[in-house]
A protein has these predicted regions:
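N-terminal, post-signal peptide beta-strand-biased segments of exported outer-membrane/organellar beta-barrel
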Residues: 1-75, 341
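Outer-membrane beta-barrel porins/channels
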Residues: 63-396
Length: 396
């Protein structure tokens, strides 16, 4: 959600390291969350659905001294999981090669670990730095089974496997400034910047052919360039004791960063995020009526996505709804959120593959775009460790 300008001693904000400076002395903030996705995907003439569950993030924030906080975050960055099987329909290939079946399988994930400091050098201003470590392993397999229709009867199979290991460090810098701050309300502007990072994964690729005997055709060990874009975010936050409003804008410079994929009609464009949200707590101090101490949240987000496929933009937009449930009379709480969103579209057509992308022979390929409608449920446990956590027990 939104939060580049948000700062609160009761909640850790992993979007901006400058917010770590707001942690109270002799307190600890700990968050852990998970999310479940229910996705309905369809093309112009087919549809499917699937469910996924992931640990979303683990956060911890502790004070080092007054105005200086240390934060740690572990967040999934990407997750790969697919299995696709296709049958060749090109009559020219069927006549000259035979029946061909393609199968693609991918699995793995990457995770980012952030270690950061937030410092409040003077009143109404905070500055922070996060060091990020990216780590993960992704495996992609493909099989091509050829059944000749003339002369030969033995199937020929081509196996390919690519394993990518990611291990790289990056940095995020952030700042927050209170344009207005008193006992009744606070109005804050926040900014973050992440320079681009070349992940340069270690790639091992092998290709094996099998017919009457097995033959290893190619084995390669190399590194290739893959960049995460530079990112700039700016946000506004207006908060009172009962009400809060957040607005964020993020720009990611993908255009011209990584090589396009003309074989599959993929190009890259700059990414724009807009996120907005409001929160209302009827009466935070009401010890008798539980529902008056609950948090009620409503939000919206829009993302034009960085991939352009076959000339089509893939927009992602969602409405979010959330509730915060206080735990007893303390400052810890359980947060539950619901997202209702849509990504992509159901366009179809024919894509012309240039000769430079298909081995010297221009060709055309039919395609169908996929539209996803998704429902996400997220659950987060937010624990606030108060002064007594730091008291040394005494026994008589």
């Amino acid at each position: 959600g939104a939060g580049v300008a948000y700062s609160n001693y009761l909640h850790m904000n992993s979007l901006n390291p400058a917010s770590y400076a707001s942690v109270m002395p002799r307190s600890v903030l700990f968050n852990v969350g998970g999310e479940m996705y229910n996705t309905y995907a369809n093309t112009a003439d087919a549809k499917t659905s699937y469910n996924t569950f992931n640990i979303r993030d683990i956060n911890m924030l502790i004070p080092l001294t007054k105005g200086l906080g240390f934060g740690f975050t572990m967040t999934p960055l990407s997750d790969v999981g697919y299995r696709v099987k296709m049958t060749e329909m090109d009559p020219l290939i069927l006549a000259n090669v035979g029946n061909v079946v393609y199968e693609y399988l991918g699995e793995g994930n990457t995770t980012q670990f952030k270690f950061g400091l937030g410092w409040n050098p003077f009143k109404n201003f905070a500055f922070g730095v996060d060091v990020i470590y990216y780590h993960g392993i992704i495996t992609r397999n493909f099989n091509t089974v050829i059944t000749p229709v003339i002369s030969e009867t033995t199937e020929r199979t081509l196996y390919g496997k690519q394993r990518e290991i990611y291990s790289k460090a990056g940095v995020i810098i952030g700042a927050q400034y209170n344009l207005l701050a008193n006992d009744l309300r606070q109005f804050t502007i926040g900014m973050t910047y992440r320079p681009r990072v070349n992940l340069r994964p270690q790639s091992t690729r092998s290709i094996v052919a099998e017919a009457n005997f097995v033959d290893t055709i190619d084995v390669q060990n190399s590194r290739f360039d893959y960049y995460l874009p530079s990112s700039f975010s700016v946000g506004l936050a207006y908060t009172t004791r009962k009400f809060g409003a957040l607005l964020d804008y993020t720009f990611e410079k993908w255009q011209g960063l990584n090589a396009p994929d003309p074989l599959n009609g993929i190009t890259y464009s700059n990414n724009h995020y807009i996120k907005a949200g409001v929160q209302f707590v009827p009466n935070p101090q009401d010890v008798r009526r539980y529902f008056n101490r609950m948090s009620y949240r409503l939000g919206f987000r829009y993302n034009n996505y960085y991939m352009n496929i076959n000339g089509h933009n893939i927009d992602d937009k969602a409405i979010t709804l959330g509730f915060g449930f206080p735990i007893r009379q303390g400052l810890s709480n359980i947060n539950i959120g619901f997202d209702f969103g849509q990504r992509g579209l159901t366009a179809s057509g024919v894509y012309n593959v240039p000769a430079t992308a298909s081995g010297g022979m221009a060709s055309s390929r039919a395609y169908q775009m996929v539209r996803e409608r998704y429902f996400r449920v997220s659950i987060e446990l937010s624990l606030f460790g108060e002064d007594y956590w730091f008291l040394k027990p005494k026994y008589e």
